[in-house]
């Protein structure tokens, strides 16, 4: 799959002799990671999009928003999580230009909707990361697992009010960056022998502990000992962003950093071919749960997972394409009796409250009491939102909040059920 990406034009960094410039990141034991400067994901996406656009047979539908998956439920059948032979026939999709919900039928449906970062106040995820695919699959009675395993990246740029948070890549620490307190002292030696290159959960908890102990709002990442030419060569985007946003020259000044929600290790359960428990429905990328990352993903492994499982999904879907029949009586979306929402401020305020609940009670460090409080407060938001949703015509903010509520509920539910501290789940009440 990597050779395929290279053949598509992905420009991974190379050394002077032409060999690939492999780097080491947190939790890894060796230099094994291909990269493109400090924006590998963007480079892979650029190459893939260009390749897909070269096929005249592929249609792109931009400015659309998926609302719900179509299953037997929409044919009037009762569907539960225990219903055998559940099937997906496509999705109801909101056309943002016409504001009408359209019916997209498909013999194969793939969910590749990314993460859930927007349920937290501080996240490196884009604004669209509202857990849409996970929520849709959950409502369609798909199986979801591991939602308690939320990865917080230890080093997001401390820049209050900015969302999404800007990521200071793991590779900066891999290249020699050192975490320090505000007095300039190092602290990772108190937590792990691997120091600043320990796995993300350990580093994030260490930073959280130091901030609470000292009453500070961030720590520092020190790169002043790295030659400026190396910084400019390997981290041009990070250097430019720090300089533009905060006026910090990272070759001369330390970078203020703070943990931010970054990745979800759980999601929609899939098999080795990315198949869900709903026939003809696949999921790949961060919205899926392959089990590959266990309870704590290692840096950059998600890109490998995505390209491998997406390809396997493609192969299996082609193989099974002819087995899906399409019912003739699938109804169009029915919004009779609804009206345009007049109080969008309610949606905005509910979203803010949800983010606050998740950040304060379901963050890096948890307790049973915090989780119960989060559950109780989220239930009130759910009741209020459901009433508004049933009365209103579909809008993106309304749907995104619905998805965020579903996802937040799953995170809290799974966190309360998890009675062992492992990986990214850390509950103070479980310390023996």
Question: How would you name each of these model-derived features?
Answer:
Residues 2-18, 59, 143-146, 217, ...:
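A short alpha-helix-loop-beta-strand transition element characteristic
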Residues 4, 10-31, 180-196, 207-210, ...:
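Glycine- and aromatic-enriched mobile tails/lids
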Residues 7-100, 105, 112, 156-159:
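Conserved redox-cofactor binding core of oxidoreductases
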Residues 68-98, 103, 248-290:
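FAD-site-proximal beta/loop scaffold in flavoenzymes
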Residues 111-112, 283:
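Redox-cofactor binding/interface segments in oxidoreductases and associated redox assembly factors
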Residues 113-123:
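Flavin (primarily FAD) binding-site architecture
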Residues 125-138, 144:
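Thiamine diphosphate
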Residues 136, 142-249, 253, 307, ...:
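An anion/pyrophosphate-binding glycine-rich loop and adjacent beta-alpha core
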């Amino acid at each position: 799959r990597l050779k395929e990406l290279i053949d598509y034009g992905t420009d991974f960094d190379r050394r002077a002799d032409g060999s690939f410039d492999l780097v080491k990141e947190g939790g890894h034991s060796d230099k094994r990671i291909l990269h493109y400067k400090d924006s590998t994901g963007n480079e892979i996406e650029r190459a893939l999009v260009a390749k897909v656009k070269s096929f005249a047979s592929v249609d792109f539908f931009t400015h659309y928003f998926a609302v719900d998956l179509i299953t037997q439920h929409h044919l009037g059948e009762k569907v539960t999580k225990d219903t055998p032979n559940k099937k997906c026939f496509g999705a109801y999709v909101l056309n943002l230009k016409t504001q009408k919900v359209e019916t997209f039928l498909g013999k194969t449906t793939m969910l590749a909707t990314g993460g859930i970062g927007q349920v937290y106040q501080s996240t490196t995820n884009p604004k669209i990361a509202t857990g849409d695919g996970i929520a849709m699959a959950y409502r369609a009675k798909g199986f979801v697992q591991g939602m308690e395993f939320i990865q917080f990246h230890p080093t997001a740029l401390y820049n209050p009010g900015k969302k999404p948070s800007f990521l200071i890549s793991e590779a900066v620490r891999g290249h020699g960056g050192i975490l320090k307190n505000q007095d300039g002292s190092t602290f990772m030696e108190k937590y792990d022998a691997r120091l600043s290159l320990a796995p993300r959960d350990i580093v994030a908890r260490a930073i959280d502990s130091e901030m609470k102990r000292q009453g500070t709002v961030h720590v520092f990442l020190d790169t002043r000992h790295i030659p400026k030419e190396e910084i400019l060569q390997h981290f041009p985007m990070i250097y430019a962003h720090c300089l533009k946003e905060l006026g910090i020259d990272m070759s001369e000044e330390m970078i203020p950093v703070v943990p931010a929600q970054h990745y979800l290790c759980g999601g929609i359960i899939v098999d080795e071919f990315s198949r869900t428990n709903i026939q003809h429905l696949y999921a790949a990328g961060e919205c899926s749960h392959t089990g590959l990352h266990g309870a704590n993903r290692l840096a950059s492994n998600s890109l490998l997972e995505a390209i491998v499982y997406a390809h396997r999904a493609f192969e299996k879907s082609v193989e099974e394409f002819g087995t899906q029949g399409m019912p003739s009586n699938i109804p169009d979306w029915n919004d009779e009796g609804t009206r345009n929402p007049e109080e969008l401020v309610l949606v905005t305020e509910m979203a803010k409250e949800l983010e606050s609940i998740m950040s304060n009670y379901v963050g890096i460090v948890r307790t049973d009491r915090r989780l119960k409080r989060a559950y109780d407060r989220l239930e009130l938001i759910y009741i209020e939102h459901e009433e508004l949703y049933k009365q209103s015509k579909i809008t993106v903010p309304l749907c995104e909040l619905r998805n965020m509520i579903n996802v937040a509920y799953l995170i809290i539910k799974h966190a309360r059920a998890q009675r062992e501290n492992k990986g990214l789940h850390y509950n103070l009440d479980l310390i023996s």
